[in-house]
């Protein structure tokens, strides 16, 4: 069985560090949140062990935290992919109303980007993954938080 170890990019005054949430696929959303908060806090306090920044398989980075709408992250080898999350903003969007007519609505939006190793992941599969992320975020119940 393959491990899913998610790297979380943490910006520090002296550079960037990527602690790893090990076996993320075995954790609940709240478990991932706890692990992320713990690793980020210890990264900022310079209290990570070398093992906690190794063996990531996929990284999530957030250039949006600095106000950037999007970025094109580079894969940290030997990982297979990295996803960038841009700034979350309210934007006008064309929506289809209940009557079937187009209407303008204000929606919370963000751009996501995915860089991946084509030797490991087919482009169509990567695109399907991003579509899945989009659908999951758009339909995630607020009570699920």
Where are these regions (language model features)?
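C-terminal catalytic/motor cores of large multi-domain enzyme assemblies
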Residues: 1-145
